[in-house]
């Protein structure tokens, strides 16, 4: 997995191009990601970078740390970082680990393809029709109170039980969901906002993890190379 960033879902809108085409996009706010811990193979058994973002504050805007456990305070104190709104981890290669103390929105550019990981909206206890898209029974005369029933759940005497994993009614949503290969349409560095084509999981103000998609690695490398060439040309012209 490549290094990524943690952002906050703002909502959805649409972007209109010069030719009049409309693109639905998700808006993600990405504040500065501060590196809290660097994990190595020798110490932890794998290579990863742990980051945080934002600051816990009360309604008055004051730092809210009195309810933070001492162990968490000590964890942040090791790198002299301010206590954030959570901890997120990105698995990286050993050669990708640097001495940097933070990562910003400059990691992404328009044209990059990313994977977005978030927690889906909780729907509570739902029936088979909504949870698994089961077909409804007849809504006609003769069907009594069984319109949304799931039907048979198994055999009778043999095996005399319901098989594990049978699709039935139950809790729906509130689980980790990954949307892959979403294209970044626009990056607003001044406001720390990126616009990603399509929808992303989670509710408004929910946190999401964004990382470069390995399935589109060739395209991502070409985009990064073009940006570097443009920057080099600008330096030469100046």
Swiss-Prot record:
The chain residues annotated with the modification N5-methylglutamine are: 157
- Which HAMAP family is this protein grouped with? Ribosomal_uL3_B
Q: Name one Pfam family in it.
A: Ribosomal_L3
Keyword match Ribonucleoprotein: yes
InterPro entries on file: Ribosomal_uL3, Ribosomal_uL3_bac/org-type, Ribosomal_uL3_CS, Transl_B-barrel_sf
**Known role:** One of the primary rRNA binding proteins, it binds directly near the 3'-end of the 23S rRNA, where it nucleates assembly of the 50S subunit.
A GO molecular function assigned to this protein is: rRNA binding
Q: Tell me its family.
A: Belongs to the universal ribosomal protein uL3 family.
Q: What protein name is recorded for this chain?
A: Large ribosomal subunit protein uL3
Give the UniProt entry's GO cellular component terms. Answer: cytosolic large ribosomal subunit
Q: How does it assemble?
A: Part of the 50S ribosomal subunit. Forms a cluster with proteins L14 and L19.
UniProt cross-references to PANTHER family, sorted A to Z: 50S RIBOSOMAL PROTEIN L3, LARGE RIBOSOMAL SUBUNIT PROTEIN UL3C
| Species whose genome carries this gene | Ruthia magnifica subsp. Calyptogena magnifica
Is Amino-acid biosynthesis one of the keywords UniProt gives this record? no
């Amino acid at each position: 997995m490549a290094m990524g960033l943690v952002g906050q879902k703002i909502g959805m809108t649409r972007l209109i191009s010069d030719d009049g085409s409309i693109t639905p996009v998700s808006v993600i706010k990405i504040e500065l990601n501060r590196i809290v811990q660097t994990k190595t193979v020798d110490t932890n058994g794998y290579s990863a970078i742990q980051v945080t973002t934002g600051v816990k504050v009360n309604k008055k805007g004051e730092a809210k740390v009195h309810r933070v456990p001492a162990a968490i305070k000590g964890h942040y104190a090791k790198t002299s970082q301010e206590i954030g709104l959570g901890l997120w981890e990105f698995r990286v290669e050993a050669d990708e680990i640097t001495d940097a103390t933070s990562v910003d929105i400059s990691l992404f550019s328009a044209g990059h393809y990313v994977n977005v990981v978030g927690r889906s909206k909780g729907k509570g206890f739902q029936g088979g029709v909504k949870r698994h898209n089961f077909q409804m029974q007849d809504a006609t005369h003769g069907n009594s109170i069984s319109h949304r029933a799931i039907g048979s759940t198994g055999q009778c005497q043999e095996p005399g039980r319901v098989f594990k994993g049978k699709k039935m009614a139950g809790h729906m949503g509130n689980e980790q969901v990954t949307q892959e290969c979403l294209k970044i349409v626009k990056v607003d560095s001044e406001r720390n906002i990126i616009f990603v084509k399509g929808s992303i999981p989670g509710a408004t103000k929910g946190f999401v993890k964004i990382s470069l998609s390995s399935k589109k690695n060739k395209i991502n490398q070409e985009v990064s190379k073009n940006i570097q060439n443009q920057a080099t040309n600008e330096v030469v012209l100046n």
